[in-house]
Structures are given as structure tokens and as C-alpha cells.
Amino acid sequence: MKRAYSDLYLRDAMRTLAGSFDAAVYTYDYELPEYYRIFSNSTFAMKFETGDPFVISGESGIELAEKVIGQHLGEDVHKQPIFNDDKTPEYWLGWALAYYQWHSACSFKTLAEIISVENMLNMYSKYHQMDITQFVDRMDELRRTSINNTKSILND
């Protein structure tokens, strides 16, 4: 499968989205499902999905969160960032989703239609210490189930 960008940028992309999720929740006080909805409908999600180097590698997660929220509100937003000593569940989810989006070439919006952000976040306790391929396998399974359910509904 052709990927939107080289794996040389993948770690940067994962850190950027992870930091964006973390900043949205802990600096900007968004609930993750709300931020994810805003992000997945933003031009920044599309740029991320297509490998825009400025978005995936050229800025921090905090900067991405500021731009996504700013675009949504129609004004610039800046707050003193709150840094967590440990990697939060939100950070992990951003990190894992960036990898999965790159791996699957599935849009962030489509991913949210397959499984809710709340359910993805609930995967943290089981998957955060596993190799990322375990998360990929589970997401692939959920995608297949979703596609099969859709086909079943259409055939009824």
C-alpha cells in the first residue's frame, strides 16, 4: 500500500498528534471527543492525512492544537502549555492513531465512524504497553466488522 508520507516522518507525526491531543485536553480544557470531532473536520486533519510536512513534522503538538482550535473558533488562541511528566492516555491515543492513520490510509473522520473516540481511549489500559502492531490488528478487526455490518444492512 502506498502511504501518504515516508516512514522517516512517522515518529514526528506520531509525536505531533499525541501532543495535540494532550494539549487540547490539559491546556485547552477540551473533552477529547469534542477536540477529535473538531480536528477530524479541520483542514489540518486533511493536511496530516496527506503528509503535509509542515503539519506532521514542522510544528509541535501544542501548535497544532492551537491552530485547530483557532480555526474552529475563528480566532487565534494561545495559552501557557501544561506539560505532563507522564504520557497520558490522550497522548497515547494521538500517538497510536497517527500510526494507524499512516498505516491504513483511512481518514481520521472515517476512523471515528468505525469506533468512537471514547472506545479508542478505553483501549489504553490494554494496548499502551504492547507493540503498536497489536493496536493495528485490533483496529483492522474493528474496520472489517464495521464494513461487514454496513454490507449486511445494505443487503437487508
Language-model segment annotations:
Residues 3-4, 8-11, 87-107, 115-127, ...:
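A structured, charge-rich N-terminal accessory region that forms the first stable segment of a protein
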Residues 7-67:
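N-terminal interaction modules that seed assembly of large macromolecular complexes
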Residues 20-21, 44, 48, 64-68, ...:
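Generic structural signal of hydrophobic/aromatic residues within well-ordered alpha-helices
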Residues 30-37, 75-80, 108-111:
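Short, surface-exposed acidic
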Residues 31, 60, 80, 88, ...:
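Alpha-helix capping and helix-coil boundary motifs
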Residues 53-89:
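Long, compositionally biased
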